[in-house]
Amino acid sequence: MYTVTKSFGLNGLSGFAVEVEADVSGGLPAFSIVGLPDSAVRESADRVRAAIRNLGFKFPDRRITVNLAPADVRKTGPVYDLPLLLALLTASGQLEEIPSDAAFLGELALDGTLRPVSGVLPMALAAAESGIRALYVPAENAAEAAEACGDGMTVYPARTAREVVDALRGIAPIAPAAVIPFDPEDAWAQVPDFADVMGQSLARRAMVIAAAGGHNVLLIGAPGTGKSMLAKRLPGILPPLTREEAVETTKIYSIAGQLPQGRGLVSARPFRSPHHSASSAALAGGGAQFRPGECSLANCGVLFLDELPEFSRESLEVLRQPLEDGQITVSRAAGSATYPSRFQLVAAMNPCKCGYYGHPTRQCTCSPSAVRQYRSRVSGPLLDRIDLCVEMDPIAFDELHTAAPSESSAELRKQVLAARAIQAKRYAAPGFEGIHCNAQLTAGQVRRICRMTPAAERLLRASYDALGLSARAHDRILRVARTVADLSGKQLLDEDALLEALQYRAQEKVEV
């Protein structure tokens, strides 16, 4: 007997429909799975056989052929266990025909318990778009799958395959999954507060500008000057995630298997801090099975690279595509996958190998050539993509004990949100599709948006000639100055905005 059960698979960040076709016929007992299955899918034959018997059903000891259509797309993971079990029960006459508008996802334990699987949200979204009315998933995946509810689709969470069978028979209906309320502003309370940071007024100001305009930042300073402390607090002053950003970020974490069980949409902007020993594959993603890397896991959030020169040159070069295009493509012999990687880069480095070059009280043990060699590990093309660079000096005793209290994250966030509101209104006009903040402006858009006072234009001309600026550096300065002006509520860029933008140039601060 022949039967079909519907399921879904993953291709990059998108789900696609899979038909699990099962045919039980006469002949010597055999169990074959075709349709480009990987090893996890092929192993499902043993899991399904044990689960059927342990649930009290009879395994059909006949010739079984299972096809996963479309047969030209590779199928990965244990997500097809549940639909395969149901297809065999139907094909062997132990279960009535399954509705054509129902789909099933889930891994099976040997006793028939359903285990959670990765990538449920993108598969659930694909199910809703393809007209599925009932989606059965493991209970631990119900919260994320429920985010795809709409257009008539209902998500049913189950803990065992027996529950699914009983629901299909009408014996014991399953209660639909509830959608968890999405409140991104609650996430701010989980981020450390800027009020804890004493001193470092220039670096704090740079972080506000970075948050307001979406700019990348490089912090240079000796150990203990607060570089990591500032970076970890940046998500607390960034705007809240929009629902579209939250869905995209949740899809990435779901595919990577890093979404906490029982969790709906990701509500906090990600903060990723990979160790400097991370390989290029760890940053870009990939592997035997396509998985997002750190660049994609930081999507819509912050990627913090501490000890920047200690990363391998190969790893740092990986950053160029996502910084330029906002996405990263991973290619392997089995195919390719593209993941969004629109992160804000915050990098930190010591001024030299020992960390004390230029320190007011500690002696640097590095030779001038060693300092140059250390700093040259950060390539020029990468520096070209960093808008703000700050040198952080050690904090004096008086700053720690007598300085006025620092502004809190809530106060700084008000400034950032006001500047972002100005940008949102500005870039709602035709011709700015896909632009959300100043850092995303193209060269042509910079000339349209960054209009200056006559005095500011004279200052920029003089600086361009005196400093030998490139065209890219010229545009980068204008983008930062535009953000400074937005924070001040000014329409034209004045001398103050340009002077502040000029002091954050990275090239001279890294070169010795």
Task: Name each model feature, range by range.
Residues 244, 251-283:
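Clamp-loader machinery-focused feature within the broader ASCE/P-loop NTPase space
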Residues 300, 306-307, 318:
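Walker B catalytic acidic pair
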Residues 111, 305-312, 355:
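Catalytic P-loop NTPase motifs of RecA-like helicase/translocase cores
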Residues 1-218, 222, 228, 331, ...:
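Peripheral, non-AAA+ core regions of ATP-driven protein-machinery
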